[in-house]
Amino acid sequence: MSQPIMLPQGWEARWDPQANAYIYVDQSTGRSQWEVPLNPTFPTSPTPHAPPQRHGRRAYPSAMYAHAYDTPAPHVGPPQPVAGYAEQGTPQFITPGFEGQQPVQQPPYAAVDHVAGQFQQMNIAPGAAPVAGAAAGAYQGAGYAEKQLHSTKTKTVNLIGLQPDVAALDNPPPPALLPANASVTSSAHSQPDPSYQRCTLNAMPTTQSLLNKSKLPLALVMAPYRSIRETDNDPDVPVVEDGVIARCRRCRAYINPFVTFIEGGNRWKCCMCGLSNEVPQLFDWDQRAEKPADRWARKELNHAVVEFVAPTEYMVRPPQPPVYAFVIDVSSAAIQSGMVAVAARTILESLDSLPNADNRTKVAIIAVSTSLHFFSLPADATEAGMLVVPDLTDVFLPKPVDLLVNLTESRPAIESLLAKLSDMFQDSHTVGSALGSGLQAAHQLIGKIGGKIIALGASLPTIGEGVLKARDDPKLLGTSKESQLLNAGNNWYKTFAIECSKNQVSVDMFLFSGTYTDVATLGCLPRYTAGQTYLYPGFNASRSEDAIKFATEFGKVLAMPIGLEAVIRVRASRGIRMSAFHGNFFIRSTDLLALPVVPQDQNYVIELQIEDDIKGSFVVIQTAVLHTTCYGERRIRVITQAMPTTDSIAELYTSADQIALATYLANKAVERSMSHSLDDARNHVTNRLGEMLTVYKNQVTSAAGGASAQLAVPENLLLLPLLCCALTKHVGLREGASIPPDLRAYAQCLLTTLPCQTLIPYIHPRFYSLHNMPPEAGTIGGDDGAMILPPALNLTSEKLERHGLFLIEDGQNIFLWVGHDAVPRLIQDVFDLASYHELQGGKYTLPRLDNPFSERVCNVVDKTREMRRGVYRPQLYVVKSDAEPALRSWALSLLVEDRMDRMSSYAQYLTTVKSKVNGS
């Protein structure tokens, strides 16, 4: 090896055998670099101005994780100063950055010292000019680099006998360690928050054969229209408003933080297909100020998630207004349950909340029983007129105008109708519902414009179009034929849904019934039109808990900002293609998803395949959502994610994201339960887990070949077996002959649409002890000023105490478990009752009493209801330890680490998986 040249005082050269090069260390600061440090006496080019200082928080995982997962962002010490943007002696350009952006082939998980050298000198503020050479990486900060490097070491853990740390479910995914010159700027936001998009693997295998060999699924998990919560301090999505949209001429990718500028900055090289494109003339021009702009401050070069205001060439017609057609069941069952009264009152109270900033929103109301009741709502009237159509076989509109009206212009008539809608049908004794015909009429009303049909049904459609029969045969439950009940019972609904999708019409279903409603069939409408299904079994508005839950959720749906007439397309680097899609949409072509409406916080899963070997050091995946905002603006939301490539199975396992994997497996299990059987779906989850851990044992650990008493997993997948065990016990998949088909079908709707933040607690509930919670729990505190929750417990009945008060919640329901020996003081302080025996179980409204413990318990309950994205308001149940068997069993079924009926405990499940891994 050649000897290093004479170094400045205080510097030391150390030989790195893995990199086959010297690394230079400043002994006074401990900073290391690959470039030879220059002696101050040597002639150098002028030193550029030092960049602005930035906070030393690691760039990725970003602080937005704290918002997505409700945990405070880690505090990192102050940044280390840097000497400049580039190595001294490197020429400086007016348009900096393109000189040092040539791709560098490099393993994503290289030697510690090697990567440390790449990450030093990168403490640069977001939006600052990019640095040249190795200092052009997207992830700056010495503190970040050190944390990243430690996380890349494959640490193997034996699960047998190990109690899972459930608090780790809130941890961010493994970081994507990109080459240092991957990003064109130094922005901390060049990778998307995982609540928008995440991948099951954060390193891309270079070949399909390597992916097949690893047995790891490769899929994107995304919620591109994620809600912005002020309570979580979520930043708004940056908007590019100047109309300058730079796209690749060949693959049509949007310019993003991972492109390369060439030819003096006049052209940019696509990071997906490699084509050279011209930089738009106005790219460096501030049109508002009419002066040159800083290219490196452009939002699309600094943010992974960005929206472009689309020019007219992205429109095939003027922007669609928000349109809401309400189809309300007014049969005797709907009136008697109180559904109609609550629905009408909620719509009335939500008229000001409906998206209507430009006064273009349109509304129609249709009531259905054994006839169709249309309402004429003229702009100059204060009362609505009703027109009844008894013909249900050939649905027609009784009037060409005033049935679909402008909300602002016809507000008096709309308010008058909603105020007395329930009373109009109060004396009706009609049995039966023509819901299908009502849906068809609503489609005729809004089909030429597009919009949303919101259907509220309280009984099975038994007359007119789309007639359904009660097919919930108890003899099928718990058998291989039960999967028939999870598929549509009438093809009319799927055919109608596809017709709606073609006309930009979405359908939301709100279902209320104490009897069979056939959620599996009616759920086809939201599934293919990008809507959502909501179920309220046994709804009775006389119970305030039922009325409040429905009114709250319905009101949030009505107030939700939505995207209209949308399409989603995912593009990826050469060699990667989309192979399968899961979620609520219609697949218009091989890679184009049609969504008449894009609701907030709805999840989609897209499977990926590697068609051709990947040559580059990193790949880029980009999701584009072309949509019309509910405020009449055509926009493109672009989400860009980059990840390094690797040819190592060990690195694939180290990069795997257990939350994304569990989400993928949930979608695949639901799909398999419908195409095969529930038993096959459960086995599929366990078999896929066994295959992954078998490969890990044989290819990564030293225990290859032969049986082992251990069950080895990488540390980043420590909780994946627990999530798989919980998934097989979930009401949507678990074994048993006592689960009503509607509840199972609805659970499967949630499993395939909930975003990760809500899905994981739905699969693996949260469990807290309240009677002995720490004094700070239930109070405001912490760095972010959020409500502090008690420590999460493992989901096992071993944690229950006869004298205790516990909370179990899965995002849909909250159970307060009260032990039989709870002291009277606890009962008095929480429930305002003298003793345990006076306490009634079931749905409950918890009183907020004038004592500190009641205040803290109520705060914890409120926090669990509000801490996640979505419209859901969990119902609260009080469960006494000696409660009625059905309620008690329901609550205990959430303790997924316990043995349940014929299903094994978590410890037994691990033994089963270990047997598969050992090949026995």
Swiss-Prot record:
InterPro entries: ADF-H/Gelsolin-like_dom_sf (IPR029006), Gelsolin-like_dom (IPR007123), Gelsolin-like_dom_sf (IPR036180), Sec23/24_helical_dom (IPR006900), Sec23/24_helical_dom_sf (IPR036175), Sec23/24_trunk_dom (IPR006896), Sec23_24_beta_S (IPR012990), SEC23_SEC24_subfamily (IPR050550). The COPII coat is composed of at least 5 proteins: the SEC23/24 complex, the SEC13/31 complex, and the protein SAR1. Golgi apparatus membrane; Peripheral membrane protein; Cytoplasmic side. Keywords: Cytoplasm, Cytoplasmic vesicle, Endoplasmic reticulum, ER-Golgi transport, Golgi apparatus, Membrane, Metal-binding, Protein transport, Transport, Zinc. This is Protein transport protein SEC24. It holds the Pfam family Sec23_helical. Zn(2+) binds at C248, C251, C270, C273. It is found in: Cytoplasm; Cytoplasmic vesicle, COPII-coated vesicle membrane; Endoplasmic reticulum membrane; Golgi apparatus membrane. GO terms for molecular function: SNARE binding; zinc ion binding. SUPFAM superfamilies: beta-sandwich domain of Sec23/24 (SSF81995), C-terminal, gelsolin-like domain of Sec23/24 (SSF82754), Helical domain of Sec23/24 (SSF81811), vWA-like (SSF53300), WW domain (SSF51045), Zn-finger domain of Sec23/24 (SSF82919). GO terms for biological process: COPII-coated vesicle cargo loading; intracellular protein transport. Component of the coat protein complex II (COPII) which promotes the formation of transport vesicles from the endoplasmic reticulum (ER). The coat has two main functions, the physical deformation of the endoplasmic reticulum membrane into vesicles and the selection of cargo molecules. Residues 248-273 are annotated as: Zinc finger-like. It is a peripheral membrane protein. Residues 5-39 form the WW domain. The keyword DNA-binding does not apply. One of its GO terms (cellular component) is endoplasmic reticulum exit site. Belongs to the SEC23/SEC24 family. SEC24 subfamily. Gene3D superfamilies: 2.20.70.10, beta-sandwich domain of Sec23/24 (2.60.40.1670), Sec23/Sec24 helical domain (1.20.120.730), Severin (3.40.20.10), von Willebrand factor, type A domain (3.40.50.410), Zn-finger domain of Sec23/24 (2.30.30.380).
